[in-house]
Amino acid sequence: MKPNIIFVLLDGSRFDRIHISPEFCDLIKQGTLLDNVTTAIPYTFGAINVILTGEYGKENGVDGFYKVSKLKKQVSFLPEILQNEGYFTSRGLIRDEILSPRGFDFRKEYNEYEEDLNLRHPELIKDTIEKSKGKPFF
């Protein structure tokens, strides 16, 4: 059986501060924490594309703040790879255009000023579990 994958990206968070949240500490105990990482590009939109393609922005097409939507079609993209392997894929972002829709079965956009940040991610996971209908999910 394929494992479910929950990828959490904390934007602007320092490693020495993540242990403040009891919920996040529980998540760390049950999963894998990468505690020695360096960003490949100094802004979130580019960095998430580097993580999900395995290629620097120069190669994947997202090499500038205003090039978020320029992910090259020929570049392998983790959500597509997992989708092709039978995973149900979903994501939740503050703006849909931050990341290519390629390979995502379900996308949710949030208003960071109006929604409770402590509730939105558990709701996304619950929605993902329901929509995945027994398939492994990412």
Over which residues does each language-model region extend?
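Active-site-proximal alpha/beta segments of enzymes that process anionic O-linked groups
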Residues: 2, 14-138
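Short, hydrophobic/glycine-enriched beta-strand segments
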Residues: 4-11
